[in-house]
């Protein structure tokens, strides 16, 4: 079947790059009409983007896992924004194609490999610096399903290592363990009557 690509946002159309996604989808379908289906939540009307209604998080996670191969995030804003929707899609096993105007990939020490494709925008953040490169990335996944599957697993593994329950809960478990099995006298946050 066709490559399944998705973009989602509920914010400002321009800041989130929804217009860029519509342009990308239209350019892809012009070149390879049968190679991909493009889903969009919050995307401007486009003849090639299948609109999807916003859904609750559990339903969205299930949708990503069952219906999406590549998640596209085209943030223009920069500082103050991360990849929350991209991280959710990666946790579901989707390959991520994203802008990184805030430098999240390197600044936070992620430095993902080729299974997270960083998309460059022009200096004014109005358009893609090289839309042909983005189209080639997507077409590569449409024609090489083995690579798509490998990159989806790597993206999911990386996402769980960074944002999965074990990674998020580890500091809490360490704190609780130090309270239950202290090597030194318990600090105020561990004391039995600390909240009285």
What are these model-derived regions, one by one?
Residues 1-55:
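Conserved catalytic-core segment of nucleotide-activated headgroup transferases in glycan assembly
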Residues 7-13, 75-76, 121-124:
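Conserved donor-binding loops in enzymes that form glycosidic bonds
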Residues 42-68, 76-82, 102:
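Conserved active-site histidine-acidic residue motif and adjacent donor-binding/catalytic loop
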Residues 61-62, 84-91, 105-106:
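Short alpha-helical segment that forms part of, or immediately flanks, the ligand-binding pocket
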Residues 69, 91-94:
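A short alpha->beta transition loop at the rim of the catalytic pocket in nucleotide-sugar-dependent
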Residues 95-98, 105:
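Short hydrophobic beta-strand element within catalytic cores of glycosyltransferases
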Residues 146-177:
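A charged, aromatic-enriched C-terminal amphipathic alpha-helix characteristic of glycosyltransferases
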